[in-house]
From Swiss-Prot:
InterPro entries: AAA+_ATPase, DNA_recomb/repair_RecA, DNA_recomb/repair_RecA_CS, Hint_dom_C, Hint_dom_N, Hint_dom_sf, Homing_endonucl, Intein_C. Can catalyze the hydrolysis of ATP in the presence of single-stranded DNA, the ATP-dependent uptake of single-stranded DNA by duplex DNA, and the ATP-dependent hybridization of homologous single-stranded DNAs. It interacts with LexA causing its activation and leading to its autocatalytic cleavage. It comes from the Bacteria. Belongs to the RecA family. GO terms for molecular function: ATP binding; ATP hydrolysis activity; ATP-dependent DNA damage sensor activity; damaged DNA binding; endonuclease activity; single-stranded DNA binding. ATP binds at residues 67-74. This is Protein RecA. The keyword DNA damage applies. CDD domains: Hint, RecA. It is found in: Cytoplasm. HAMAP family: RecA (MF_00268). GO terms for cellular component: cytosol. This protein undergoes a protein self splicing that involves a post-translational excision of the intervening region (intein) followed by peptide ligation.
């Protein structure tokens, strides 16, 4: 402890030397100065401001806006320019694409007379101009449109066909290293607009000729045959927006020449011979539960995502949940096939009738019924891949069943009824009590000995907190089995809740007044194709074959397909300019056009979705939707209506929109026009939304001191 003063003194000497060498403020304690809230530039869409978490684009940071062509990237950037200018800011636009339309910018609110515009000839020139403007300290926002158009000088001066691998990426990396500090010091926001391109074929993995692609009708075809014949086929593909397996058209075919080697994969599946097989180059991307992974990084025992039929309806899944809490179990498939077996158990004639009732609810699932020498009846259902994750979550290896909080949230009256019918007992009160109690009384006990200790407590608390039941946990008998004991009042309340779901053969477990209410009828659904995890059984280097060429296809829209049921990527989307911009950007926004807005048959705009894929100033991964009207840009009023309805400030009744008793109009277009004509109402709604959500940093308060700057 005697060394502490010496350490403090040494630190003070070091800080003094640093300030002497590099200037005052070059190092300081974070608490020495009052922290300023983050200053922002509004985007023009309240929904996007909310998704960004701070009310707009942060000042002094790099922002990347990327997306497909005609998705609205430049429109979003120009609205930020207009909002910066509206409060007296200075804006610059580096038009590397030479495509800025002044009239359109003016309609969005941009002061084109004072806008600084540069149309550079090379990427180096564009970035040097941007750097010099930023270092002037007079700029509030600069837009570079676009990164893809920042062509290095060497490439422009070279010959057609010359290769310049990584040249633009190195240029961007160097420029961003120089710009980052200057942006922070000057408080300038730099918006980089970026394009999407696809990584196809030779650099990013391919398939062996014999690998079979899953077609839209469920059949398969060799990828080599599809490519060589340029077959016009539709394949199964996963749509992440709708979370569904959908047919998609093959729009391009690639034969990328010979490969050094292929990896042969064997993956478990439920049907056919129980195995999916395919051969891919080590760098081909395969979908796993944790995301995309290169084939060369996978080993036996890892899990990938595969398409399997889903058979269970919501009602049937509830039957499984209730049975798992009681006498049912899920057993792993021991034949190296995907899926787990759901087994039901019953004893005696009453239980057999109850077992038949359960079997009827699962009637569309293939099963076998058997009886052992002791008279116990069993029903074994065919292995179901959709129950694999449930089995992994419930059986953790200690022999007891583990029910998580998420499991308990899924409990319905039907689930509780099946659990009670499986493991519950009902004791009728004494004759004297029966005489005093209309309809009789009794107590329920439900055995929970097969569950973990933590699960027993969670289940008791769930019944108490969610259903208001007086339930105690105790041990009974010489074996000390754990049971949940219901009070008389809780028994009546619980039986009232589950009575409509009790099987006729189990009504003896109910009070007389609750009998005869059962009305459960089987509910079946058509099988659907869904993604489920599947275990990799084997990976090895495939022996050389006659054809060692690499084949790939490009799929419309989703950029993924299935090989013998396993999900693989065909052409990952990426942004231009290397990875430096991903690293240096504080905010990255993925802009997509999701719908065309029409007035009759005429297109009048687009519905746009923006995903915040990176955010270092607020929680990321939020998304916003708003309208972009042709010739007008982002519809601020439309966004206010959407957010107003969502936050409860604007009331929607049928097609009418109302704000504080005042009708805004019938239909969104009329309500939009009302707010356009009544700016004070629009501003009031915006203010209330921002106050409720706590966004929009205030930077003009008297108690906030400006950061001192030494020149």
């Amino acid at each position: 402890m005697a060394q502490v003063p010496d350490r403090e003194k040494a630190l003070e000497l070091a800080m003094a030397q640093i300030e002497k060498n590099y200037g005052k403020g070059s190092v300081m304690r974070l608490g020495d100065e009052m922290c300023q809230p983050i200053s922002v530039i509004p985007t023009g869409s309240i929904a996007l401001d909310v998704a960004l978490g701070i009310g707009g684009l942060p000042r002094g940071r790099i922002v990347e806006i990327y997306g497909p062509e005609s998705s609205g990237k430049t429109t979003v950037a120009l609205h930020a320019v207009a909002n910066a200018q509206a409060v007296g800011g200075v804006a610059a636009f580096i038009d590397a694409e030479h495509a800025l339309e002044p009239e359109y910018a003016k309609k969005l609110g941009v002061d084109t007379d004072s806008l600084l515009v540069s149309q550079p000839d090379t990427g180096e020139q564009a970035l040097e101009i941007a750097d010099m403007l930023i270092r002037s300290g007079a700029l509030d926002i600069v837009v570079i449109d676009s990164v893809a158009a920042l062509v290095p000088r060497a490439e422009l001066e070279g010959e057609m066909g010359d290769s310049y691998v990584g040249l633009q990426a190195r240029l961007m990396s160097q420029a961003l290293r120089k710009m980052t500090g200057a942006l922070s010091n000057s408080g300038t926001t730099a918006i980089f607009i970026n394009q999407l391109r696809e990584k196809i074929g030779v650099m990013f993995g391919c398939m062996n000729y014999s690998t079979r692609v899953t077609l839209a009708d469920g059949s398969t075809e060799k990828i080599g045959k599809i490519v060589n014949n340029k077959m016009d086929v539709r394949v199964l593909s996963y749509d992440p927006v709708t979370d569904r397996i959908v047919p998609r058209k093959v729009v391009n075919w690639f034969n990328n020449g010979p490969a050094e080697q292929f990896l042969q994969f064997t993956v478990e599946k439920s049907g056919s011979n129980g195995k999916s097989q395919f051969a891919a180059t080590p760098n081909h991307l395969i979908r796993t539960p944790g995301g995309w992974t290169e084939a060369g990084n996978l080993i036996a025992g890892d899990r990938v995502l595969a398409v399997e039929p889903h058979m269970l309806s919501d009602q049937q899944f509830q039957v499984v949940l209730g049975s798992l809490m009681g006498d049912g179990n899920l057993s792993p498939n021991l034949c190296d096939r995907n899926g787990v077996r759901f087994r039901l158990l019953g004893y005696g004639c009453k239980q057999v009738e109850y077992l038949q009732w359960k079997k009827a609810l699962m009637g569309n699932i293939r099963h076998t019924v058997r009886e052992n020498s002791m008279g116990a009846s069993f029903i074994d259902f065919t292995p179901l891949p959709e129950l694999v994750e449930l089995q992994r979550a419930v059986y953790l290896g200690d022999g007891k069943k583990f029910l998580s909080e998420e499991y308990l949230k899924a409990l319905t009256p039907l689930v509780l009824a099946i659990w009670y019918m499986d493991d519950g007992s009902f004791t009728v009160g004494s004759k004297r009590v029966q005489e005093r109690t209309a309809g009789g009384s009794g107590r329920i006990e439900i055995c929970v000995d097969a569950m973990t200790e933590g699960t027993r407590v969670r289940l008791r608390d769930y019944l108490c907190d969610t259903h208001g039941l007086d339930v105690r946990l105790r041990e009974v008998g010489s074996a000390g089995k754990a049971v949940l004991v219901f009070s008389t009042a809780a028994t009546a309340k619980f039986q009232s809740l589950i009575a409509p779901y009790v099987a006729p053969s189990m009504e003896y477990k109910l009070l007389p007044q609750f009998r005869g209410r059962g009305s459960v009828t089987p509910q079946f659904v058509e099988p659907t194709q869904q993604l489920v995890p599947a275990r990799v059984l084997d990976v090895h280097v495939k022996l050389s074959t006659r054809s060692m060429n690499r084949f790939d296809i490009e799929v419309e829209g989703n950029h993924n397909y299935f090989v013998d049921g396993v999900m693989v990527h065909n052409s990952p989307e990426t942004t231009t300019g290397g990875k430096a911009l991903k690293f240096y950007a504080s905010v990255r926004m993925d802009v997509r056009r999701i719908e065309t807005l029409k007035d009759g048959v005429d297109a009048v705009g687009n519905r746009t979705r923006v995903k915040i894929v990176k955010n270092k100033v607020s929680p990321p991964f939020k998304q916003a939707e708003f309208d972009i009207l042709y010739g007008k840009g982002i519809s601020r009023e439309g966004s206010l209506i959407d957010m107003g309805v969502e936050q409860g400030f604007v009331r929607k009744s049928g097609s009418w929109f109302t704000y504080e008793g005042e009708q805004l109009g019938q239909g969104k277009e009329n309500a939009r026009n009302f707010l356009l004509e009544n700016a004070d109402v629009a501003n009031e709604i915006e203010k209330k939304i921002k106050e409720k959500l706590g966004i929009g940093a205030v930077v003009t308060d008297d108690d906030i001191l400006p950061t001192p700057v030494d020149f």
